[in-house]
Each structure stands twice: as C-alpha cells, then as structure tokens.
Regions:
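Residues at the C-termini of beta-strands that transition into short coil/loop
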Residues: 61
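Conserved nucleotide-cofactor-binding alpha/beta core module
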Residues: 68-69
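Alpha-helix capping/helix-boundary segments
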Residues: 43-44
Length: 222
C-alpha cells in the first residue's frame, strides 16, 4: 500500500525436517507480493532456484560471502543480489563488483566481533544459535582479561572487550557507491520507528548528495 518493496528474510540455517514448510512459506509470501527473499541456507537457495526460478533470491550476509569466488558461485545460481560480509574493505568490494552482480553492504548497525554466519559463540555460551536467528549476543557482555598467571589485567575501566562500536558508514557513502555498492543495509530490527526513520532519512540524504556530486555532510549531521 505504501509503494515500498518487501524483502522477506529467511536468513537462518534450515533443518532437513523444516525444508518443506519453509518452501511453502516462501511460495505463499511470493504469491502475496513479496519482491525478494534474503536466504542464508545453500540447500534452500538451490531448491528455490530450481523449483521457482521466477522468484528473486538475495544471498544473506549470514552466508559469509567475502571474495570473488563466493560471488561467482552466487552468480551461477542466478541470485539477484549478494549481501557481502561486513568485514570487507572498499578495495575488496571494488574488486568483487567487477563480476557484475548487484552488491549490498552493511551501512549502519551492530558490528559483530565474530564473522557472520560462522559464529558459534552464542551456541556455546547461551545455547542459542546465531545461525538460527537466536543470537544471545554474548560478545556484548562484560569480560575480564587474564594473563598467563590467571591474574586480572587492568583495562582502564573497559570491560566490553568483545564489543566493537556500532557500524556507521555515512561519511563513506561516496566511496561505497564508487566501489560498486548498489544497496546499503541499515539495521532496524527491534529498533524504535523514530530511530529507523532518522537513520534511513540521513542515509537517503547522503546517497542523493553523493549521486549529485555535492558535499552534504553538514546537513546530514544536523
């Protein structure tokens, strides 16, 4: 009704006995008007592409695609877009973009300490799998650093040792566009609507300014 595109996230590892139910859900959502599906599980991706080639599929960042070989494999499957790993440099993104596949990169949100899609820390510490959409975020908890004698090392009051600052690329938007990024992913899950509106509006303004070749950082900062 609002004229917005709807991308349905299916970015979890799918168990064998869940596959048929997930396929039915995807088909139903497609009939209802979903524009694309963001998928992590390679078995699910292959099955959707084989059964319904008309359905547009995007590769989730949870698939940990981080080089040209991975993107080439995605291209061979016929995916519409690849969401790259958050850890890549602009130079690496630029190299990957030469494969002529639409690329999406994280623009704003939490930056995991571990690599997306291959982190088992939540499973080991909290019995909740990050690859099943249930990350307990143990990397955001306070920790102590011990030396070889098991003595606590002073970190000057810092105890969030595994918790990087949130990801913010608004100052890098022109460089990301030049590198070949076609879409920016902004974290909005479990965020207040006001927060989502503010962040998305700021990035929209920055993207429009970059495409026009003007410096709009002062306006964005306000």
């Amino acid at each position: 009704l609002a004229g917005a595109r709807v991308y349905v996230t299916v970015n979890v590892v799918v168990k064998w006995d869940e596959m048929q139910r997930v396929l039915r859900l995807i088909r139903r959502a497609w009939i209802l008007g979903a524009d694309a599906f963001i998928i992590q599980d390679w078995g699910l991706m292959a099955q959707v592409r084989k059964t319904w080639p008309e359905i547009e599929c995007h590769v989730s960042t949870q698939a940990n695609i981080h080089d040209t070989r991975g993107v080439a494999a995605c291209k061979k499957l016929g995916v519409g877009r690849v969401t790259l790993s958050r850890e890549l440099t602009k130079e690496e993104i630029s190299t990957i973009s030469k494969l002529v596949v639409e690329l999406e990169c994280f623009g704003h949100g939490a930056l995991c300490f571990c690599y997306s899609g291959i982190c088992h820390m939540s499973s080991m510490r909290g019995d909740r799998s990050a690859n099943r959409g249930a990350c307990a975020q143990p990397c955001r908890l306070p920790y102590e650093l011990l030396n070889s004698k098991h003595e606590v090392v002073s970190m000057g009051g810092i105890d969030r040792l595994l918790c990087p600052k949130d990801y913010c690329t608004i100052d890098d938007v022109p460089d990301m566009i030049e590198a070949g990024v076609g879409s920016l992913k902004i974290e909005g899950r479990m965020k207040a609507p006001e927060y989502v509106y503010s962040v998305v509006s700021s990035y929209r303004q920055a993207i429009d300014a970059a495409e026009k070749g003007v410096d709009n950082q002062a306006d964005v900062a306000r």
